């Protein structure tokens, strides 16, 4: 009965059933395709494109296109996709995640849906986790696409914008996720449309989709610029923090890794820095530096979170174990770590543009992916990306043995046991792969193996340059490899001669990861394509995962039972403790990512509006009509700011409106009070607008239209970019402090949303105001680059604007508020 219900309601079963019917049709064409000449087979591409132009859909040509790509793969790379790979390709084409075990040929599988979707001419992006894999796959799998007459591009970090344009214009593009995101941000900072590199985002296939869309979802992509900040602040804060004692001067939450001063710590800070009150508003910057120094010294660990290489602090990717050169911790944390380690303190940066992977990849018209481990995170993929996880059957049954965890009271006993197990298996010639979470663990085990004179290789962030070479030999007889956090993912470990008879590859986990999915990735390195294999995790109650989630009770039980450091226990109750801890962390991390997305959605909506505004400016030959409409909007804001309490203008309002218009907008055709006095607000707006446009058009009459258009675009882009960068910083500060609203029984997210949109509306009003003022008060010089014109326009206006401010040292109650809100002072900051 249960099986019948499962078949009726299980989406995955129904999808696989549908895919199998299509796969049967594709398979039936195999003999027909194999008889075609190379020229005849390749000619199908043009035929498919013609059919699509004539109104057929991808669904109409799917079976034939898959069959053509399958045969082309066999002729170009000597591999014909198996039946299970056809199922995987279909799952990917329909916007799902294909979960395929290690060694099942994901790289070849994605060729089938990529070929089909590339026939539309709108572009297909195949995303990998690093440039090594992008380069390898673009050459290896790229030969199939080229054989079929499609163009293949490779997007690398060092390419010029022209080379990137050529790559993005190809039918198939191989790229890393980072480079795609940064190109998108850079495209929305250009001042000429011909400098953009990306086309509209059509279809994307993400390899190792769990790593990119889940593990890296909390890390935003940031393009930043330098800001001046004294290094002394970092060194002073670091010196003070190093003098503090845990639980007396500061406390650290093991679960969240949050570090904060106690009352005693605050008192010592006031004494150290000679302050009356540390939390006075004037000491905000100092408090920020102290908090970052606390985090740097007590929550961030050398060789775990970062390494020091050539006198620089380099971030370690927590999910791959690779170094992230060119990336920096934000908000001054990177500089705090540099002060901690005694290396040169780099200039702090200011965010110029930012986006999360979550929001970037959701912009694609169609998104799909593939990985060996995604089922445990299906809820997240479904809720955030609208993708289902389809588990693809293996080509051959998995015969790998996954042993129950061995639990030890302490780390020392656990490490000794791991070394003994390696020694025993190495003596038999069986290859061993040891997975560690931290660099320091890999180096500790390496030292222990060296003492035992066991030859081995270490693969971590410090020697990642030999990654491919080390992984290539990891399955050979007698090989011992220690890898940090699955460095080497994306490259299969193939068994050497005689290894199958020894039991295949032995995988040892030195501790459980926070996520069961990462553990499954480590297990998946063994037993590929029906090979034998063995996996086992060695766990201690001193491991970080169990320390954070209450292992003290169980450690006490082991002690009472008489278990010593080197004695292991295999018990379902203890194994459930580990799994329970992992589920808690996974749930917590999912909540964090959902919360991050909720907050980022606020910024994302605002980002889309700003970027749409920029693109409108770049894509139109002329924005002159838009500029004139902007003048009217700004004049309306001036007049409407005097209508807060009434629908009619008062006598003093007319004088204030007149002064604002004459000072900020008009040059030659200034207005007299008699021209607007007593008129309806709409008539006042029309009168000022007519004079403003007359003034502006007269200024432009000797200027060629193309120069005028260039000038208007330059000023508009510069103003928008300046305010947007400032707004990013403002929203970041709002986000940092919004959590405190919870103490006032207010939803922090709701408060952030409402206040964020209020700030955004005010920014839009200021953008409109400044564009109007700059254009009306600036002189136009011909034959200047757009950037130079914009900078000059802004510089000139800044001086003029300063003069206006100097006219009155006292702000009147009915004056426009200096904060730029557009309201009267008495109804804004003068309350």
Language model: regions and residue ranges:
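Conserved P-loop NTPase motor core
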Residues: 1-562, 611-612
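Short, Lys/Glu-rich amphipathic helical modules
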Residues: 429-442, 620, 646, 673-677, ...
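Hydrophobic, well-ordered secondary-structure elements that form the walls
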Residues: 434, 482, 724, 760, ...
């Amino acid at each position: 009965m249960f099986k019948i219900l499962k078949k009726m309601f299980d989406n995955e079963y129904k999808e696989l059933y549908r895919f199998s019917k299509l796969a049967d049709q594709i398979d039936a064409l195999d003999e027909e395709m194999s008889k075609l000449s190379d020229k005849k087979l390749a000619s199908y591409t043009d035929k498919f494109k013609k059919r699509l132009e004539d109104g057929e859909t991808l669904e109409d040509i799917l079976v034939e296109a898959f069959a053509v790509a399958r045969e082309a793969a066999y002729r170009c790379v000597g591999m014909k996709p198996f039946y299970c790979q056809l199922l995987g390709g279909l799952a990917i084409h329909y916007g799902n995640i294909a979960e395929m075990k290690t060694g099942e040929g994901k790289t070849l599988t994605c060729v089938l849906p990529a070929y089909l979707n590339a026939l539309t001419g709108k572009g297909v992006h195949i995303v990998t986790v690093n440039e090594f894999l992008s380069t390898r796959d673009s050459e290896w799998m790229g030969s199939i696409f080229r054989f079929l007459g499609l163009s293949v591009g490779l997007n690398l970090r060092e390419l010029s914008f022209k080379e990137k344009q050529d790559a993005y214009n190809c039918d198939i593009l191989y790229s890393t996720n980072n480079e795609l995101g940064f190109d998108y941000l850079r495209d929305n900072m250009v001042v000429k449309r011909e400098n953009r590199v990306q086309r509209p985002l059509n279809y994307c296939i993400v390899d190792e989709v769990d790593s990119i869309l889940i593990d890296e979802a909390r890390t935003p992509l940031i393009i930043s610029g330098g800001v001046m900040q004294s290094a002394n602040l970092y060194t002073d804060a670091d010196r003070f923090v190093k003098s503090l004692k845990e639980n007396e001067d500061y406390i650290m939450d093991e679960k969240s890794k949050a570090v904060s001063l106690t009352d005693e710590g605050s008192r010592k800070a006031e004494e150290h820095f000679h302050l009356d009150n540390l939390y006075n508003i004037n000491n905000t910057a100092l408090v920020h530096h102290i908090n970052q120094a606390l985090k740097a010294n007590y929550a961030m660990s050398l060789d775990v979170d970062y390494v020091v290489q050539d006198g620089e602090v380099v971030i370690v990717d927590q999910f791959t174990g690779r170094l992230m050169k060119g990336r920096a911790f934000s908000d001054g944390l990177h500089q705090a770590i540099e002060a901690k380690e005694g290396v040169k303190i780099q200039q702090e940066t200011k965010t110029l543009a930012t986006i999360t992977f979550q929001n970037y990849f959701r912009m694609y018209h169609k998104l799909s992916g593939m990985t060996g481990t995604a089922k445990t995170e299906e809820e997240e993929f479904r809720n955030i990306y609208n993708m289902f996880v389809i588990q693809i059957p293996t080509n051959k049954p998995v015969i790998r043995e996954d042993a129950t965890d061995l639990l030890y009271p302490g780390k020392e006993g656990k490490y000794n046991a791991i070394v003994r197990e390696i020694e025993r298996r190495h003596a038999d010639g069986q290859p061993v792969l040891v997975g560690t979470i931290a660099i320091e663990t890999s180096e500790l085990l390496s030292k222990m193996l060296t003492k035992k004179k066991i030859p081995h290789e270490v693969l971590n962030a410090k020697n990642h340059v030999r990654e491919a070479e080390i992984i290539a030999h990891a399955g050979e007889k007698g090989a011992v490899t220690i890898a940090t956090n699955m460095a080497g993912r994306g490259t299969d470990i193939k068994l050497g001669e005689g290894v199958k008879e020894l039991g295949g590859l032995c995988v040892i986990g030195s501790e459980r990861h926070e996520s069961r999915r990462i553990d499954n990735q480590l297990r998946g390195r063994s037993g590929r394509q029906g090979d034998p294999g063995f996996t086992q995790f060695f766990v201690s109650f001193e491991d970080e995962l169990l320390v954070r989630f209450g292992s003290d009770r169980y450690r006490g039980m082991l002690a009472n039972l008489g278990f010593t450091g080197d004695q292991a226990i295999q018990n379902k109750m203890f194994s459930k403790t580990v799994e329970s801890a992992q589920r808690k962390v996974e749930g917590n991390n999912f909540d964090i990512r959902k919360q991050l997305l909720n907050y980022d959605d606020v910024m994302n909506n605002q980002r889309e509006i700003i970027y749409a505004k920029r693109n409108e400016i770049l894509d139109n030959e002329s924005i002159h009509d838009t500029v004139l409409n902007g003048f009217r909007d700004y004049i309306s804001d001036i007049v409407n700011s005097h209508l807060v309490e009434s629908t009619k203008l008062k006598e003093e309002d007319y004088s204030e409106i007149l002064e604002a218009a004459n000072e900020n907008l008009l040059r030659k055709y200034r207005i007299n009070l008699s021209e607007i006095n007593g008129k309806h607000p709409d008539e006042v707006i029309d009168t000022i607008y007519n004079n403003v446009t007359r003034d502006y058009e007269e200024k432009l009459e000797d200027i060629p239209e193309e120069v005028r258009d260039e000038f208007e675009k330059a000023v508009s882009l510069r103003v928008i970019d300046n305010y947007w960068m400032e707004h990013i910083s403002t929203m970041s500060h709002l986000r940092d402090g919004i959590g405190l609203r919870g103490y006032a029984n207010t939803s922090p997210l709701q408060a952030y949303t409402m206040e964020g949109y209020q700030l955004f509306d005010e920014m839009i009003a200021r953008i409109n105001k400044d564009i109007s003022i700059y254009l009306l008060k600036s002189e136009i010089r011909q034959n200047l680059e757009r950037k130079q014109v914009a900078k000059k326009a802004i510089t000139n206006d800044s001086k003029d604007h300063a003069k206006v401010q100097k006219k009155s040292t006292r702000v009147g109650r009915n004056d426009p508020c200096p904060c730029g809100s557009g309201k009267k002072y008495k109804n804004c900051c003068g309350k």
